[in-house]
């Protein structure tokens, strides 16, 4: 079971990093359209993050409702903490990305590209983190 879990996490890590690398490489290939490319990368990463967030909600439902004979209070408490954690993390991500892009803040296209690249990178990292919470048995 532990080997299977390690293999799963290794696969997810490689998937996230290869998606991130592919996005970076694609954005560099279209030098004149970096801002648009970074925006598309951010949107794709946001979809991945939303999918992983929903998957965690589904795993929590499976664990607390079905596997542990209807522990509704624990399920609700977990979902409340997850929602709070996600909201707090989004504030941190946005603040960190504004900091990373500070030097280009007055150059709108560069600043926008910096923000979107940072948001995509951090969102993919968060998606990987969410995959590790309440792993399926």
Model segments located where?
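N-terminal alpha-helical modules
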Residues: 21-137
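N-terminal signal peptide c-region/cleavage motif recognized by signal peptidases
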Residues: 13-20
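Bacterial N-terminal signal peptides that target proteins for export
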Residues: 1-8, 14
């Amino acid at each position: 079971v532990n080997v299977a879990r390690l293999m799963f996490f290794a696969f997810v890590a490689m998937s996230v990093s290869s998606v991130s690398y592919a996005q970076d490489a694609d954005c560099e290939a279209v030098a004149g359209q970096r801002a648009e490319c970074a925006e598309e990368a951010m949107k794709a990463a946001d979809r991945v993050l939303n999918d992983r967030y929903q998957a965690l909600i589904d795993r929590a439902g499976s664990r607390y409702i079905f596997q542990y004979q209807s522990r509704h209070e624990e399920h609700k408490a977990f979902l409340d903490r997850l929602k709070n954690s996600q909201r707090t993390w989004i504030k941190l991500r946005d603040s960190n990305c504004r900091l990373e892009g500070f030097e280009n803040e007055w150059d709108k296209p560069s600043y926008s590209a910096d923000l979107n690249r940072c948001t995509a990178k951090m969102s993919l990292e968060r998606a990987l983190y969410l995959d590790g919470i309440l792993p399926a048995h």
